Amino acid sequence: PQITLWQRPLAKIKVGGQIKEALLDTGADDTVLEEMDLPGRWKPKMIGGIGGFVKVRQYDQIPIEICGHKVISTVLVGPTPQNIIGRNLMTQIGCTLNF
């Protein structure tokens, strides 16, 4: 799809069998989701943003569905005010910025 930027670029995603809304954030390296249970093992990670550093759980090889695309990606789970789709996932679905 082509998304204008007059409002926040939000997309519905399906992760861990749950449907969530997330912000497409080209400034974010990683995909970060609000607290949720995901299957499999995780490892601790620290990520930094405008608000400083936060501890998150890194889950690898998580199936995600976004805009009709199915991908397997790394997902970080932790305290975030907004679910964020980062460049790690957007590159997999062929997302580009065009001017």
For each predicted feature, which ranges?
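Charged, flexible boundary elements
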Residues: 8-13
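Aspartic protease
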Residues: 14-99
